């Protein structure tokens, strides 16, 4: 759909594309591997698009929210969310607006910024930390048998 609008966006003085991915683009969460993979793909696509459109009036932003109070979280069990802080929707929107106004092309509020940092400098450690709740669930299930 975005490609249908590109000719129109290129004609104006200022335009923006905003893709919404996730902090989970940086580190997979075992209980939602496909979700994380799609967000990682969107992150890569957004970076490529930003370079492709760098000589146009179009800015390409990426909002990478952390776990946010939305209906999506209702799909997870409480035990799945242990150790994960959840951002209020209003605060996430405020962070987006602030980043957008400052021309921050990659907006990573809350834990998303921490995930990016940890994935770059301590990739094995953060993957083990993110995997721990799932491993604990498997151990508990094994003991129950």
What are these model-derived regions, one by one?
Residues 2, 38:
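Active-site helix of classical SDR
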Residues 4-13:
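A short helix-coil junction within the Rossmann-fold of NAD(P)-dependent oxidoreductases
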Residues 6, 41, 46-54, 59:
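Catalytic Tyr-X3-Lys helix of short-chain dehydrogenase/reductase
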Residues 22:
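Residue(s) in the substrate-gating loop at a strand-loop-helix junction
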Residues 25-27:
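Conserved catalytic-site region of short-chain dehydrogenase/reductase
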Residues 29-33:
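Active-site loop immediately N-terminal to the catalytic Tyr-X3-Lys motif
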Residues 51-112:
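SDR active-site lid
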Residues 85, 90-145:
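C-terminal tail/cap regions
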């Amino acid at each position: 759909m975005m490609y249908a609008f590109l000719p129109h966006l290129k004609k104006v003085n200022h335009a923006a594309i905003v893709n919404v991915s996730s902090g989970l683009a940086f580190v997979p969460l075992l209980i939602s591997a496909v979700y994380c993979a799609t967000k990682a793909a969107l992150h890569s696509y957004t970076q490529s698009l930003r370079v492709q459109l760098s000589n146009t009036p179009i800015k390409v932003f990426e909002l990478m929210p952390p776990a946010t109070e939305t209906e999506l979280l209702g799909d997870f069990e409480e035990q799945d969310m242990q150790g994960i802080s959840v951002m209020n929707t209003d605060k996430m929107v405020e962070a987006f607006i602030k980043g957008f106004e400052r021309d921050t092309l990659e907006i990573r509020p809350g834990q998303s910024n921490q995930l990016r940092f940890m994935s770059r400098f301590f990739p094995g450690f953060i993957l083990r930390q993110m995997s721990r709740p799932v491993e604990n669930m498997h151990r508990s299930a094994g003991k129950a048998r």
